[in-house]
Protein backbone atom coordinates (compact mmCIF):
# COMPACT_ATOMS: atom_id res chain seq x y z
CA UNK A 1 0.00 0.00 0.00
CA UNK A 2 2.90 2.35 0.64
CA UNK A 3 3.24 5.15 3.15
CA UNK A 4 0.28 7.23 4.26
CA UNK A 5 0.71 10.99 4.47
CA UNK A 6 -1.08 13.21 6.95
CA UNK A 7 -2.13 16.34 5.14
CA UNK A 8 -3.36 19.43 6.99
CA UNK A 9 -4.89 22.24 4.97
CA UNK A 10 -5.70 25.64 6.41
CA UNK A 11 -8.01 27.54 4.11
CA UNK A 12 -10.31 30.43 5.00
CA UNK A 13 -9.78 29.81 8.72
CA UNK A 14 -10.74 26.17 8.26
CA UNK A 15 -8.52 23.19 9.08
CA UNK A 16 -8.94 19.89 7.29
CA UNK A 17 -6.94 16.78 8.02
CA UNK A 18 -6.51 14.19 5.27
CA UNK A 19 -4.73 10.89 5.15
CA UNK A 20 -3.64 10.17 1.59
CA UNK A 21 -1.60 7.19 0.48
CA UNK A 22 1.38 7.46 -1.83
CA UNK A 23 -0.68 5.82 -4.59
CA UNK A 24 -3.56 8.28 -4.11
CA UNK A 25 -1.21 11.26 -4.28
CA UNK A 26 0.52 9.82 -7.34
CA UNK A 27 -2.85 9.35 -9.04
CA UNK A 28 -3.81 12.95 -8.27
CA UNK A 29 -0.57 14.23 -9.79
CA UNK A 30 -0.93 11.95 -12.82
CA UNK A 31 -4.43 13.26 -13.54
CA UNK A 32 -3.16 16.82 -13.13
CA UNK A 33 -0.31 16.22 -15.60
CA UNK A 34 -2.66 14.46 -18.02
CA UNK A 35 -4.91 17.51 -18.21
CA UNK A 36 -1.95 19.84 -18.54
CA UNK A 37 -0.72 18.03 -21.65
CA UNK A 38 -3.50 19.91 -23.42
CA UNK A 39 -2.09 23.24 -22.22
CA UNK A 40 1.57 23.39 -23.35
CA UNK A 41 1.64 27.14 -22.66
CA UNK A 42 0.24 26.74 -19.17
CA UNK A 43 -3.28 26.92 -17.80
CA UNK A 44 -5.02 29.18 -15.32
CA UNK A 45 -5.41 27.47 -11.97
CA UNK A 46 -9.12 28.29 -11.97
CA UNK A 47 -9.67 26.58 -15.32
CA UNK A 48 -7.67 23.54 -14.22
CA UNK A 49 -9.77 23.24 -11.05
CA UNK A 50 -13.07 23.41 -12.96
CA UNK A 51 -11.99 20.83 -15.55
CA UNK A 52 -11.02 18.52 -12.70
CA UNK A 53 -14.37 19.11 -11.03
CA UNK A 54 -16.39 18.31 -14.13
CA UNK A 55 -14.29 15.21 -14.83
CA UNK A 56 -14.84 14.08 -11.22
CA UNK A 57 -18.56 14.69 -11.56
CA UNK A 58 -18.79 12.79 -14.84
CA UNK A 59 -16.91 9.88 -13.29
CA UNK A 60 -19.26 9.76 -10.31
CA UNK A 61 -22.33 9.83 -12.54
CA UNK A 62 -21.03 7.08 -14.83
CA UNK A 63 -19.19 4.78 -12.42
CA UNK A 64 -20.31 5.65 -8.90
CA UNK A 65 -16.79 6.36 -7.64
CA UNK A 66 -14.31 9.20 -7.66
CA UNK A 67 -11.69 9.81 -10.31
CA UNK A 68 -9.25 11.22 -7.73
CA UNK A 69 -9.24 11.00 -3.93
CA UNK A 70 -9.35 14.75 -3.46
CA UNK A 71 -12.27 16.52 -1.81
CA UNK A 72 -13.63 19.60 -3.54
CA UNK A 73 -14.34 22.72 -1.51
CA UNK A 74 -16.75 25.45 -2.49
CA UNK A 75 -14.59 28.54 -2.90
CA UNK A 76 -16.10 31.87 -3.90
CA UNK A 77 -15.46 31.45 -7.62
CA UNK A 78 -16.17 27.74 -7.87
CA UNK A 79 -15.15 24.26 -6.71
CA UNK A 80 -11.46 23.63 -6.03
CA UNK A 81 -9.68 20.34 -5.23
CA UNK A 82 -8.43 20.75 -1.66
CA UNK A 83 -5.13 18.87 -1.79
CA UNK A 84 -4.10 20.32 -5.15
CA UNK A 85 -5.09 23.81 -4.04
CA UNK A 86 -2.98 23.53 -0.90
CA UNK A 87 0.03 22.20 -2.81
CA UNK A 88 -0.13 25.01 -5.36
CA UNK A 89 -0.54 27.57 -2.59
CA UNK A 90 2.55 26.10 -0.93
CA UNK A 91 4.60 27.10 -3.98
CA UNK A 92 4.14 30.70 -2.88
CA UNK A 93 5.36 29.94 0.62
CA UNK A 94 9.00 29.84 1.67
CA UNK A 95 10.08 27.21 2.35
CA UNK A 96 7.67 24.85 0.62
CA UNK A 97 6.48 21.98 2.81
CA UNK A 98 8.86 19.07 2.31
CA UNK A 99 6.00 16.60 1.89
CA UNK A 100 4.99 18.41 -1.32
CA UNK A 101 8.39 18.24 -3.03
CA UNK A 102 7.75 15.03 -4.98
CA UNK A 103 4.34 16.25 -6.09
CA UNK A 104 5.76 19.55 -7.34
CA UNK A 105 8.59 17.94 -9.33
CA UNK A 106 8.00 18.94 -12.95
CA UNK A 107 5.31 21.48 -12.01
CA UNK A 108 5.75 25.25 -11.82
CA UNK A 109 3.36 28.01 -10.82
CA UNK A 110 3.78 31.61 -11.97
CA UNK A 111 1.20 34.09 -10.80
CA UNK A 112 -2.14 32.39 -11.53
CA UNK A 113 -0.93 29.91 -14.17
CA UNK A 114 0.46 26.42 -13.78
CA UNK A 115 3.00 24.82 -16.11
CA UNK A 116 4.21 21.23 -16.41
CA UNK A 117 7.45 19.83 -17.79
CA UNK A 118 6.77 16.29 -16.53
CA UNK A 119 4.68 13.69 -18.35
CA UNK A 120 1.89 11.67 -16.73
CA UNK A 121 2.55 8.06 -15.77
CA UNK A 122 -0.14 6.38 -17.86
CA UNK A 123 0.02 3.29 -15.68
CA UNK A 124 -2.21 5.25 -13.30
CA UNK A 125 -4.76 6.26 -15.96
CA UNK A 126 -7.44 3.68 -16.79
CA UNK A 127 -9.62 3.67 -19.88
CA UNK A 128 -12.56 5.06 -17.91
CA UNK A 129 -10.31 7.76 -16.41
CA UNK A 130 -9.20 8.77 -19.88
CA UNK A 131 -12.74 8.92 -21.25
CA UNK A 132 -13.97 11.29 -18.55
CA UNK A 133 -10.83 13.42 -18.61
CA UNK A 134 -10.85 13.71 -22.40
CA UNK A 135 -14.54 14.65 -22.38
CA UNK A 136 -14.00 17.43 -19.82
CA UNK A 137 -10.88 18.72 -21.58
CA UNK A 138 -12.58 18.76 -24.99
CA UNK A 139 -15.70 20.47 -23.66
CA UNK A 140 -14.06 23.13 -21.50
CA UNK A 141 -10.52 23.66 -22.78
CA UNK A 142 -11.41 26.77 -24.77
CA UNK A 143 -14.03 28.12 -22.36
CA UNK A 144 -13.26 31.46 -20.76
CA UNK A 145 -12.27 30.94 -17.09
CA UNK A 146 -14.99 33.33 -15.91
CA UNK A 147 -17.66 31.53 -17.92
CA UNK A 148 -16.33 28.22 -16.63
CA UNK A 149 -16.59 29.55 -13.08
CA UNK A 150 -20.26 30.38 -13.66
CA UNK A 151 -20.91 26.91 -15.09
CA UNK A 152 -19.39 25.32 -11.99
CA UNK A 153 -21.80 27.14 -9.70
CA UNK A 154 -24.13 24.15 -9.73
CA UNK A 155 -26.50 22.98 -7.01
CA UNK A 156 -23.72 21.12 -5.15
CA UNK A 157 -21.57 24.26 -4.99
CA UNK A 158 -24.54 26.44 -3.99
CA UNK A 159 -25.53 24.12 -1.15
CA UNK A 160 -21.98 24.07 0.20
CA UNK A 161 -21.76 27.86 -0.01
CA UNK A 162 -25.05 28.12 1.89
CA UNK A 163 -23.67 25.88 4.66
CA UNK A 164 -20.67 28.18 5.07
CA UNK A 165 -22.96 30.96 6.29
CA UNK A 166 -23.74 28.87 9.38
CA UNK A 167 -20.40 27.10 9.72
CA UNK A 168 -17.26 28.07 7.74
CA UNK A 169 -15.91 24.55 8.32
CA UNK A 170 -18.61 23.02 6.13
CA UNK A 171 -17.43 24.17 2.72
CA UNK A 172 -16.55 20.71 1.43
CA UNK A 173 -18.84 19.49 -1.36
CA UNK A 174 -20.01 15.92 -0.75
CA UNK A 175 -19.58 13.41 -3.56
CA UNK A 176 -23.30 12.63 -3.39
CA UNK A 177 -24.11 16.30 -3.99
CA UNK A 178 -21.60 16.40 -6.86
CA UNK A 179 -23.24 13.35 -8.43
CA UNK A 180 -26.74 14.77 -7.95
CA UNK A 181 -25.72 18.05 -9.57
CA UNK A 182 -24.43 15.99 -12.50
CA UNK A 183 -27.89 14.39 -12.78
CA UNK A 184 -26.94 10.92 -11.57
CA UNK A 185 -29.98 8.65 -11.33
CA UNK A 186 -31.41 7.39 -8.03
CA UNK A 187 -29.81 3.96 -8.37
CA UNK A 188 -26.37 5.50 -8.78
CA UNK A 189 -26.90 7.87 -5.85
CA UNK A 190 -27.95 4.93 -3.66
CA UNK A 191 -24.88 2.98 -4.82
CA UNK A 192 -22.55 5.86 -3.94
CA UNK A 193 -24.24 6.28 -0.56
CA UNK A 194 -23.84 2.59 0.29
CA UNK A 195 -20.16 2.69 -0.65
CA UNK A 196 -19.68 5.73 1.60
CA UNK A 197 -21.41 4.01 4.52
CA UNK A 198 -19.18 0.95 4.16
CA UNK A 199 -16.06 3.08 3.79
CA UNK A 200 -16.88 5.12 6.88
CA UNK A 201 -17.56 1.97 8.88
CA UNK A 202 -14.16 0.57 7.94
CA UNK A 203 -12.21 3.76 8.58
Predicted feature descriptions by range:
Residues 2-203:
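Domain-edge interaction signal
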